[in-house]
């Protein structure tokens, strides 16, 4: 990161958005932790990849707030600061509507999403894929990795080759995880069937 970028990042006021995101502390995740931590993980991924756009970072901190807290007053988000309305619009763009199936949502981001929406969605998916290593429902893990390959890889191709590579590596890793889990499970079944006490 250049000195100029570090100075720009230093001037970005994130605390009010972090404060709003604390509303997600009670929302748990299948892989452990809570949705609040996921917001911060997503922001950290963006910074790690050199994204320091203030609207993008602010939106990443609250990107699940509209979806996970349906009763959330969006005016609180709009009125946070001078960029609040832009942040709200980006959060809306990456929020799946209740009548939208996941494949349609991801296709919409791919075909019509702004560059920031695409970047945010890829960072969000990287965070989700990392925590997927702590999920024990193998059918879900398989379905999610397939969905990532089919719908999110193309989005990543549009925004950042390094992020795409990380997603590809995570998908490979999670598929090995499922295979290893299935091997262990089949050995346990075999051992149980041979145990004649």
What residues fall within each predicted segment?
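Active-site helical microenvironments for divalent-metal-assisted chemistry
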Residues: 1-197
């Amino acid at each position: 990161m250049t000195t100029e970028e570090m100075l720009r990042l230093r001037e970005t006021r994130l605390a009010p958005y972090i404060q709003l995101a604390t509303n997600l502390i009670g929302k748990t995740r299948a892989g452990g932790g809570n949705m609040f931590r996921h917001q911060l993980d997503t922001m950290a991924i963006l910074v790690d990849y050199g994204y320091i756009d203030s609207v993008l970072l602010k939106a990443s901190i609250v990107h699940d707030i509209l979806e996970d807290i349906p009763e959330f007053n969006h005016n609180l988000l709009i009125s946070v600061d001078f960029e609040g309305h832009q942040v709200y619009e980006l959060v809306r763009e990456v929020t799946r509507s209740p009548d939208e199936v996941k494949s349609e949502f991801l296709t919409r981001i791919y075909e019509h999403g702004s560059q920031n929406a695409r970047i945010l969605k890829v960072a969000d998916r990287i965070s989700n894929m990392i925590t997927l290593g702590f999920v024990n429902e193998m059918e879900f893990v398989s379905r999610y990795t397939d969905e990532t390959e089919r719908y999110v890889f193309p989005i990543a191709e549009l925004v950042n080759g390094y992020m795409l590579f990380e997603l590809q590596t995570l998908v490979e890793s999670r598929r090995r995880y499922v295979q290893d889990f299935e091997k262990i499970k089949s050995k346990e079944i075999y051992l149980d069937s041979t145990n004649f006490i």
